[in-house]
A protein has these predicted regions:
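Membrane-embedded helix-loop-helix hairpins and adjacent transmembrane boundary segments
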Residues: 1-312
């Protein structure tokens, strides 16, 4: 509610400042988490991987046949490659460069992005740290839920103060993405769907802009209600991880926005029906593949949203 609230009234201006604060916190937390497992490498890299392999040999393999998400090259490499291309074309990613005050800052922006993103990628190793700490994924005889493993690792290895900072950093990672999605989804719905239906080709003026701003705020409220409902469903009926729930919706959005964004960047005078048809088709295909269990990768209790998104 807090995030939806300040995005509703602050918009992109608020997001610039909150994202900057969140990014600094996340970077500090990433370094703390990576450093927390330094002692696992005292015997060298080979000892570290041997320790991981002794817990579960599948953890050191390229693919894991027993996993519902990492079974073969198609899931691990191809799907992630396609989704990666779609991600960099998303409105909430592209608009980051538009927030630069000067065009000359673009190269510096890209350099910082690559450095920080590389550090964030290495945070995946913290999952190995947690698995070494909890080899059988239990604590005090109780099974640890998938979404609670990192929290348990933080509680066990850090003081209350440091643990609080880390938890704030983990929350910031979700909030920064949520802000971008709120901005891009609400703007897309308002500008590309509602405006053409209600106002046609009416030229921009102060009155119309004010009306669209109010419409956008209503859209954000509706999105908040939907988000609260789905979050409650995940809490009541968890399916492996909240990450699966998030990926299912986000990848559907990625698929829907991919073609329209590319057309907007590289083509001129595109018929309105073209991006609309592409978006509608992508959404229908994504959810049909996922919920209709149309492939071997999207059957069973846990299904891979990346496969549905790739096909869409």
């Amino acid at each position: 509610i807090f995030v939806f609230g300040y995005m509703m009234f602050g918009g992109a201006n608020a997001m610039i400042y909150t994202n900057a604060i969140q990014a600094v916190i996340m970077l500090v937390v990433a370094i703390i988490l990576l450093g927390s497992g330094a002692h696992f490498f005292e015997g060298g890299i080979s000892w570290f991987w041997e320790k991981i392999a002794s817990i579960d040999p599948n953890l050191t393999k390229n693919f894991n046949q027993t996993s519902p998400l990492f079974r073969d090259w198609f899931e691990v490499i191809f799907c992630n490659f396609v989704i990666g291309i779609a991600i960099v074309c998303q409105p909430h990613i592209i608009t980051r460069s538009l927030m630069l005050e000067k065009g000359a800052s673009l190269n510096k922006f890209l350099l910082y992005t690559i450095i920080v993103e590389t550090i964030f990628f290495f945070v995946l190793f913290v999952g190995f740290y947690a698995r070494i700490e909890f080899p059988d994924l239990t604590a005090d005889g109780q099974a640890i839920k998938m979404d609670g493993i990192m929290s348990m690792y933080v509680v066990k290895n850090f003081s209350n103060f440091t643990g609080l900072i880390i938890i704030v950093g983990l929350i910031s990672a979700g909030l920064s993405t949520l802000e971008g999605l709120i901005q891009s989804v609400s703007t897309t719905i308002t500008s590309d769907l509602i405006r053409p239906m209600l106002y046609g080709d009416k030229s921009d003026d102060e009155t119309l802009q004010r009306k669209l701003k109010n419409v956008n705020r209503i859209v954000i409220i509706v999105l908040a209600v939907i988000a609260i409902f789905w979050s409650n469903q995940q809490l009541a009926n968890p399916k492996l991880s909240v990450g699966i729930l998030a990926q299912n919706g986000v990848y559907a959005f990625f698929a829907a926005a991919f073609v329209p964004v590319l057309q907007g960047i590289f083509l001129k005078n595109v018929p309105r029906i073209a991006p609309m048809a592409a978006s509608i088709t992508a959404i229908i295909v994504h959810f049909s593949v996922y919920y209709g269990q149309l492939t071997p990768y999207t059957t069973g209790e846990v299904r891979n949203p990346a496969v549905a998104g790739t096909i869409a």
